């Protein structure tokens, strides 16, 4: 095909079929140059809509604006978009660029669905699978898991497999929503350069377990567990005793820390100082949160450890005797006896326990809800992997998967 003919066809395609929503005025100019080069007489339909995130509070209205030809400097009837594709902005920066920054990609995905195209294909973070800020992502997660029009999804544990210079905590995924598709999703996981693919009902759980083989193990185990008989029911919530991560430096701390044990300051507190576990002392009367557990035997578990791909999954647990509390760095599990606490530690150290936690873990954080697929046991005795594999009827293949995935805690 001659160059003139190629350019003519591309010009016609741009005019009739390509419409780009840009997040900044500068992006409009970049889009024009990318699509049309220096053909200044060509029509390039790229628009910037001010305060677009505010407008997304009413997505039906915004969708009507986008389908209005006047928005794109065109005439005629309302536009019907056949496909929506893109890599939307991921988050509003809260200052740190970390996990507390508000996600916004879900708004663009929901807007795409509101436009009612035949196809949607977006690249977005995978954090919505099982974590993220619940008030912002829970409805989006529920909608995605129950959408039987999602025909394909590919998840990458390492975002650099897609964008070599960009690290996105929790990885990335892209998906295809096909209005004509109705049924299971062809799901692929790319991890360590290997791809595994399986047909999946995304709505099997209230989260999306990233690893298909692990999803099958979780399903088998949970079929044998009664409601509310899982470890999340005994693990504390965040900041369990109201003490921040480093009580010396935090301006939010209302508890005074002392480095010497005394009759007045008789409760030990485990906290993190310069990345080192440190013990100090506090007054019993200064603990206002979960004070009834001060005189119970406890197991302290780091709230954050490694990453969503870490083969250890949870941090090193620590037995805490009666008369102890911890900072925000840790969660805790209370027990009536030291033996029960130490037997729980034996359970936590098993690969069985930790692989079930990993089903929910997609970042470094491990809140109590991440223990929801781990069944409770009789803690009058210690536990081993061999006992647990037999108790829940795991196959040789399932055991081999766990053994290859999870490393022992030394």
For the regions a protein language model found, what residue spans apply to each?
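SAM-dependent methyltransferase catalytic region
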Residues: 1-153, 158-162, 171, 175, ...
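C-terminal substrate-recognition regions of SAM-dependent nucleic acid methyltransferases
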Residues: 159-327, 333-396
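Short glycine-enriched loop/turn motifs at secondary-structure junctions
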Residues: 12-15, 324-328
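Short, amphipathic C-terminal "tail helix"
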Residues: 400-410
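A structural signal for short hydrophobic/aromatic patches embedded in well-ordered alpha helices
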Residues: 31, 344, 402-403
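Short cationic amphipathic helices and targeting signals
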Residues: 18-20, 331-334
